[in-house]
Amino acid sequence: MTTGTVDGICYEVHGWPVAGREVVLLSSGLGGSAAFWAPQMKALTERWPVVTYDHRGTGRSVRALPPGPYSVDDMAQDMVKVMDALGLTKAHVVGHAAGGNAGLALALNHPDRLGKLVVVNGWSRPDPHIQRCFDTRIHLLNDTGIKAYVHAQPIFLYPADWISRNHARLMAEEAHHVAGFPPREVMLARINALLAFDIDARLEEIPHRVLVSASADDMLVPMSCSQRLAARLPNADFQQVAWGGHGFTVTDPETFNEGLIKFLEGA
């Protein structure tokens, strides 16, 4: 594994060298941590070099955002910076929620830098249910604090039966997540960027091969958002899983990984 930093963004390369090879770039969701992709790493690194990174403001990356409004376009621009640092002309991007939305922004703003795109539980326009969930998380963070926000987080991410079976694991991870939580203003700016994200009128401009992947029981992002993406993107496939929640890449990695590998290996 090779590590580096560009403009404050901490990244890792699993599989070196990358020159002249197809590369997979993984982009996490709201939390921003590259560690989110642990359940996918073995399946991917057996086949391709893989680049992971902590989003700006999170994890090991710089713990602040630039002055002024922050947007999903800014998240996409950070992908370009990581690719530039590695000398990559393009990459296949796999993004979860915020990371998938950033991949869509990359497709529009820098189409030549994107190979294939995988959008997991993403969306293309504001949605009332997503707004309600994020409003609740904002109130938790502002009115109760980081510990309450982190303690409630599994409710938004995972199915109830999985939470029950994995209670000990989740409690053990909680202190780690609290200790590494981004500054409050960073998290609020990231949430507001996602709430403002709206490329719905431009979906037909994205010619890339896209896999839209969604879980039917996602409590945070309605599956109808993914169905809309898959229907309106000109060159999209749709992967639906019946169970797993918003974080089904964690709760059912085997099902997700099978569809992911098949898509990336396909024509």
Curated annotation (Swiss-Prot):
The keyword Hydrolase applies. Residues 23-139 form the AB hydrolase-1 domain. Its EC number is 3.5.1.-. It catalyses: carbamate + 2 H(+) = NH4(+) + CO2. Pfam families: Abhydrolase_1 (PF00561). Keywords: Hydrolase. It comes from the Bacteria. The keyword Transmembrane helix does not apply. One of its GO terms (biological process) is nitrogen utilization. GO terms for molecular function: hydrolase activity, acting on carbon-nitrogen (but not peptide) bonds, in linear amides. NCBIfam families: RutD. Involved in pyrimidine catabolism. May facilitate the hydrolysis of carbamate, a reaction that can also occur spontaneously. Belongs to the AB hydrolase superfamily. Hydrolase RutD family. This is Putative carbamate hydrolase RutD. The lineage of its organism: Bacteria, Pseudomonadati, Pseudomonadota, Alphaproteobacteria, Caulobacterales. The gene is rutD.
